[in-house]
Structure formats: C-alpha cells, structure tokens
Amino acid sequence: MNGAIQAKRRALAAVEGPHPWRLRSLAVCASTETELGRWLERQAPAEQLTVPRLVVARRQCFGHGQQGRRWESPAGGVWLSAALPWPAEPQVAAAPGLAVALALAEALIARGAPVQLKWPNDLLLLTPTGPRKLAGLLPGLRLRGSRIRWARIGLGLNGRNPVPAGAANLRQQPGLWHGEPLALTALVLRALERAMALAGEAEAVRTGAEALLAPTDPQWLEGAWWQPQGLAPDGGLRLVRGDGRERILRRF
C-alpha cells in the first residue's frame, strides 16, 4: 500500500520534486494516533524531526477527535496521523491545525469540492441541504523546553465510507475520484507537504484560513455575548464584547 500511495502522490505533483516520507500503512488498528506515538517513542531523533512520518489505516476501531470524542473510522475513508518537521521557534511557526486545514481545503476546492473551515478543527462540505462535516483534525506540537521538535496532526476524511447524520462524504465528487480512499490519501499527503511549506508563514496561514472560515455563532462567556472577529495566529478564535474588550478562545 505504501508504494501505491507514493505513486499516486507523485502523480499529483505538478512541478515539485518528490518529498521524502516514512510511511506505515495498516489494515486495521485501534488508533493511528497511538501507533504514531509508539513509533516516535521508539525511533524519533533526540532533537527536531527532519523527515515526516505518517501512519495510515484502512479503518480504526477507536479513532478519536477533539476532547476524546469518538470518530467513526470505517473502511472507505482516510484515517491517518502524521509527525511533520516544523520551525523550532514558536514565534515564527504557523499553527499546524490551521496550516493543514488551509492546505487540505485548498486542495479539495481546486478539485471541485465546495468546503469551508469550521472552527476549531473541522472541514465542512457545502451541500444542497446545508454544510456537513467532511473532515476533522487533531493538531498538536511536540516541544523541548520552548522549542518545537515537530508538529503532529491526526486527520480523518470521509471518502466512500458511510457517515453519520450531520456528516458528508465524497462519493458524489467526480473531481475527487468519487471518494476513492487511496487517491484521497495521496491528495492528503500533498496537502501535508503544502502545510510544511507554509509552516514558517504564520500570518499567511492565518489570513488564508480566515478567508475560508464558516460563520461562527456568538459565544456566551462570563455572563455576556462575544462576537467572533476572525482568527488569532495560533488558531484561536478572536472574540469582541460589546464594550470593546477582546479575548482569544482556544479549544485545541
């Protein structure tokens, strides 16, 4: 499966040369997040990661998203976790969740899928019956002291798999191979490479992601309504209260 993914990924590369990857593909696992964590514990370098690593599974038994919520992961979707080289200095590094969400959204839009970003870490497919969840991200950073060693991203993308109420897949998208998971996995790898290229461009990532952000409801906090006013560089949601006070809401 690794060779097939790499071949399809190279076929999607218009100009850029092949990016090195260390891949592990599994028929089934409890969680790609767990598998990646074990791999990194055993073999990761002491300092920064230099070659991206990725674990992909045909299906997961216990996939999870934000705050431990279960993510349905049957065969037919793309279920993976990746460790990505990232700038060591936090002040110049883009938020990995924003960078990956932006890169994946742009890749899907370029192939005809109308998508938006839902804060904090979801991609929505715009359908005739309204927006539906298409993908979810689980981002993070591995630090040593104040320096970044690598970024981590867990990703679930609905391809041909059955989906629960409120979600969508890509079966009806001819530009995306009608959701064929191997081709979609290659597309995701290309999006991850794009995210790595954007990793040192925090402001470009923030503005790009903000342009694709779905409308966000007002937030009731501290006894008052706060209006969303875009994104902070770290991916937090900027909120403004009626008296002009500002705060950042973070859920990642």
Task: Indicate where each model-derived feature is located.
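N-terminal lobe of the biotin/lipoate ligase/transferase fold
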Residues: 1-109, 129-131, 231-235
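Long, positively charged amphipathic alpha-helical accessory segments at protein N-termini or as interdomain linkers
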Residues: 2-9, 18-19, 87-115, 125-252
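A generic structural signal for short beta-strands and their flanking turns/coil linkers
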Residues: 51, 76-78, 119, 151, ...
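General beta-strand structural signal in soluble alpha/beta enzymes
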Residues: 57, 115-119
